[in-house]
Amino acid sequence: MTARFTHTDEGRSEESWAASPLTGLPGAELSDRDGVPLRHLVVLAAHPDDETLGAGGLMARAATLGAAVTVVVATQGEASHPSSPTHPPERLAALRADEIRAAAACLHPRAEVILLGLPDGRLAAHEDAVTAALRVRLDEPGTVLAAPWHLDGHTDHDAAGRAAAAAVIGTAARLLEYPVWAWLWAEDADIPWDGAVRLDLDPAERDAKAAALAEHTTQVGPLSPEPGDEAILLPGMVARFERSFETFLDAERFAGIFERLHAGVADPWGFRDRWYERRKRALTVAALPRERFRRGLEVGCSIGVLTADLAPRCETIVATDVSPAALAAAAQTVAAAGVGLAPQGRVDLRRLRLPAQWPEGEFDLVVVSEVGYYLTAAGLDLLADRILGSLSEDGVVLLCHWRHPMTGWALDGDPVHERLRGRLGLPVAVRHVEEDVVLEVLTRPGVGSVARETGLL
């Protein structure tokens, strides 16, 4: 991933942020997804100081509420000063371990600090280890997990966010993601505001956060007067974390939009009754270049109408959605179509927040239909990366989206396809464009035409 910033960038000003939707956000809900009030706060930090910058006020609030706090630190930040003439990585790691213990004590007197000791700058290769370390700490009712935003723009932060999203699958833990470096580079369109919440901090909580940040001396001040020992957190950056509130991205709020939609209307988009939708589904299925696929993935299945049409073409298909109501309706749709559900049947319905969460295994078919608009540009990039990481050598990707403006969302179909197509970098086998809809089929290099694959040529 190309870096969007350096730590010396001034970035977006606080004045600009003050004019953004940031100021009108709803309050954070400090409970698990079942509504049990906060009892255990688990804070994931990619590096020592992330916990203070992104969730220091939340940690102080947990102390006030009598909740336990566990800080899981993925790396010890030994690569923060790669050109330091005075502090080799081993010394920095030791110093930063001491700093985070002192900082955590400022925020919560009984905070437990767990150092995983994974390599700084290479966390993406160790996401499973982070997920495993978190998962064993998320079982208690009333657990909230705070973690770096998975689209923060720093490779370690993004990896930590993905690991956290994987860890909460199958638990009641609420995931609150905190931006850090995004405050430098992001514009309003880069932030998924529908999921954003704020935690207003009282003066004592702000003081505790300031004291904790001061403990990270290797980051807020120079290591020495020598070149290469300069401070990492410059005053302009620190100002983002001196606000009277902290900002989190709550996946449950974003999912709640679709949950309310599906709970209120049996078929929110008229999939069953509208000729436009029935014709588009027929085009979608007809565009698939093979008669049968081993294992398919449908990103955002809604009530399962397309799922039921795709299932006969797949030995198994994983269909995902963020909404439990949508998945319940999808189960009924699939059953009515005479297609069985996993584990005995071929349709595996899963509640996942893609692309932050992602199903295991390999797929030779991935269908992204009418969901790309709901992601930011960075989210589309991550979706493409996830697809490429799980697409078989003979894999096929189908994209299908409405081309007219999407009220309330930044993107419509054409820019969604342009972004995904560019990031995937796969040959386009089919491109069907109408005034209303764009449908494209992309394949791995070497996948032949239908005629070639079926022996006509």
Report the location of each language-model feature.
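Class I (Rossmann-like) S-adenosyl-L-methionine-dependent methyltransferase catalytic domain
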Residues: E252-E291, R295-V299, I303-C314, V318-P359, ...
